[in-house]
Amino acid sequence: MGARVAYLVVGLSVAACLVALFGCAGGNFNSGQRAPWRGKVEEACLTGGAVHASTYVTPMETIDGPGVCGLERPLRVSGLADGRVTVTPPATIGCPLTAALDRWIKTSVQPAAYRYFGSRVIEIGQIASYGCRGRNGNNWGRISEHAFGNALDIAAFRLANGQIITVANAWWRGTPREQAFLAAAFTGACQEFYTVLGPGSDRFHYNHIHVDLLLTNAEHGSHYCRPILRRGVPMAQAAGDPKTTASVTPLPFTGPGAD
């Protein structure tokens, strides 16, 4: 990964790791038991063949606690989409989330990358996977889906042409193409995952896109997605895109569906 993204991901990951290591010292983690359905869903996902062990998806030992935190069948995921998209650093997540990430990359992320840059995504930078903690770092509130390996925070994308797109820089201050790419990836995530949060949703998600599979919005449809984005970005504006610290000049669109 490029130096800028590497420093970003490493720096933010250190903070996330500290939370994961020490977040369970107090809070609502040591009472109750992990819901049995979680382990059953993990097992069904693996036995159903949604995800297979490989050089980039490695089974790990069961994570049992502290408290309700953990996974029955955790995976160390260093690559997605048949290994064509590197995950940096490798993520500790469950099978259901791994399968959903594969689908999202195939149906939303790669088509958007080809459409706006004529290049495919080869790496995503994540800053939080499994971690025993509460939502938004509040250990006395509701337990985060990160505590069950059922969530991932994505901070950056790297393309095959060398371009790096970080959520922190490009969401608000990126070129029209960068913003359109992130909007398309975000909108696609809202169809694939149950909870999706990005910059503008609250002060905790200013630098990443959070995705998880917890059904939190059953009364109003199954998906909770914030912020709500306006549809479309006029690509005519992209001809004069200014250079940013996270971008190179976009290439003409040559991906699937090009005329």
Question: Which sequence ranges carry the predicted segments?
Answer:
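Sec-dependent bacterial lipoprotein signal peptides
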Residues: 1-24
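Short, intrinsically disordered, charge-biased short linear motifs at domain edges
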Residues: 9-14, 28-34, 54-56, 210-212
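Bacterial Sec signal peptide processing site at the extreme N-terminus
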Residues: 18-44
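Catalytic cores and adjacent binding grooves of peptidoglycan-active enzymes
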Residues: 27-31, 60, 64-67, 75, ...
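Active-site acidic/histidine clusters and adjacent loop/turn architecture
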Residues: 37, 44-125
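Active-site-adjacent substructure of cysteine-protease-like catalytic cores
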Residues: 115-149
